[in-house]
Amino acid sequence: MSSFETTIGLEVHVELKTKSKAFSLSPVNFGDPANENTNVIDWGYPGVLPSANKGALESGMMAALALNAQITRDVHWDRKNYFYPDNPKSYQVTQQQTPIGHDGYVEIKKEDGTSKRIGIKELHVEEDAGKNSHSGKGYSLVDLNRQGTPLVEIVSQPNISSPDEAYLYLEKLRQLIQFTGISDVKMQEGSMRVDINISVRPIGAEKYGTKVEIKNVNSFQYAKNALAYEEQRQRDELMAGHIIGQETRRFDEPTKSTILMRVKEGADDYRYFPEPDLPVIHVSDEWIKAVKSSLPETADDRIARYINKFALSKKEAAVLTQTLEMANFYDQVVDDGADPKRTANYLIGDVNAYLNETQLDLQDTKLTPGHLSGMIKLIDNGTISTKQAKKVFTAITDGEEPKAYVEKNGLVQLSDPNKLTPIINQILDDNQQSIDDFKGGKDRTIGYLTGQVMKKTHGNANPKIVHEILLAELKKR
């Protein structure tokens, strides 16, 4: 058993899904050409005056409510002063003294079935910096499209004790934020980023160990790997009698290790002071009530609804609510008249397998709720079998309409007794031994005869109808 304990705190930056930036009217569009979505406020021109984005502040309030945090009633803005090429103003507008939310928590479910409450110290609404790109040819380029994009920074309490707990916390945090609708939390697009603080100390020590930072981790798995490596590195250093330095490190994915960026000799001095160009904002009870009433259904609420209304298992409901787009897709398919249980089975099984194989998000595929619903209804009304549905599923992932595909490819299941009975009688005429076996109590014979009918009809016969007709005809003989 280890003689050390680990302390982890996470700072998560979530890009808010607003139409314009935090303090200017520049649009927010991911993927646009460099420096297209900027103006003089983003550039920090002298004499220009910012204006706070009400939608960004309300998004921060929604995040605070989703994370069970208290909302600050009088919010003022602060300048965080630092120089870096992607920050032409040489300061960032943030909420150092009066964060929009404080003293919240997130409940995580551990693999052993127990729960743990991870504290939320505070949530800040602030603006993002631009983006540097280094060509390696002796110069760097700066794209200010991201400059001024509104963020909410979520700072956890340092009561995360392991890389596994950190991973569970990040997954739950992403789910909670995504279901509010304030962010798409796509890490691959930079709309969710993680800064890690980790220290290790001997069990029973009164003081925390020396904190090491790992900056700008853009994957939950990377965060888990970085923490696992850094936890072991610090333990090894302490076991060897070395002192842990106060450092900033980065995660190197190919080696799954952390690499030193710089040594910190003291705390950063950002010379915070109140932003003189933005007024204090009073958050009233009525405003909080209005924002709270606008919060959509949470993931936990959906899980309860899926269990109570559609008789899904807790595990099925949990898988369907891992992402907002999957939950919304499920609701749309069921609202279109598809069987809730069969819909859940297809989304959890075939659809998830397809997404894993193609490495696509559901919204980026050609699959639509209407097409999946149409296929499921064709199964339930007996038009196609579950075996034929495999071909139809492949077609609808390519954007084809299920009913048209079935008709075009002759996949309509043969269910008409008037057409099936002559075929079945011909099979029976050719298999007298099977008839004798059945009458002798060998019930398995029915499976063989059903197989012969399916072979004769090229797999298009309805197995249920075939079974019923076979029993009826066998009794006549």
Swiss-Prot record:
It catalyses: L-glutamyl-tRNA(Gln) + L-glutamine + ATP + H2O = L-glutaminyl-tRNA(Gln) + L-glutamate + ADP + phosphate + H(+); L-aspartyl-tRNA(Asn) + L-glutamine + ATP + H2O = L-asparaginyl-tRNA(Asn) + L-glutamate + ADP + phosphate + 2 H(+). The keyword Ubl conjugation does not apply. SUPFAM superfamilies: GatB/YqeY motif, Glutamine synthetase/guanido kinase. GO terms for biological process: glutaminyl-tRNAGln biosynthesis via transamidation; translation. Its EC number is 6.3.5.-. One of its GO terms (molecular function) is glutaminyl-tRNA synthase (glutamine-hydrolyzing) activity. Keywords: ATP-binding, Ligase, Nucleotide-binding, Protein biosynthesis. Transmembrane segments: none annotated. NCBIfam families: gatB (TIGR00133), PRK05477.1-1 (NF004011), PRK05477.1-2 (NF004012), PRK05477.1-4 (NF004014). Allows the formation of correctly charged Asn-tRNA(Asn) or Gln-tRNA(Gln) through the transamidation of misacylated Asp-tRNA(Asn) or Glu-tRNA(Gln) in organisms which lack either or both of asparaginyl-tRNA or glutaminyl-tRNA synthetases. The reaction takes place in the presence of glutamine and ATP through an activated phospho-Asp-tRNA(Asn) or phospho-Glu-tRNA(Gln). Belongs to the GatB/GatE family. GatB subfamily. Heterotrimer of A, B and C subunits. This is Aspartyl/glutamyl-tRNA(Asn/Gln) amidotransferase subunit B. It comes from Oenococcus oeni (strain ATCC BAA-331 / PSU-1). The gene is gatB.
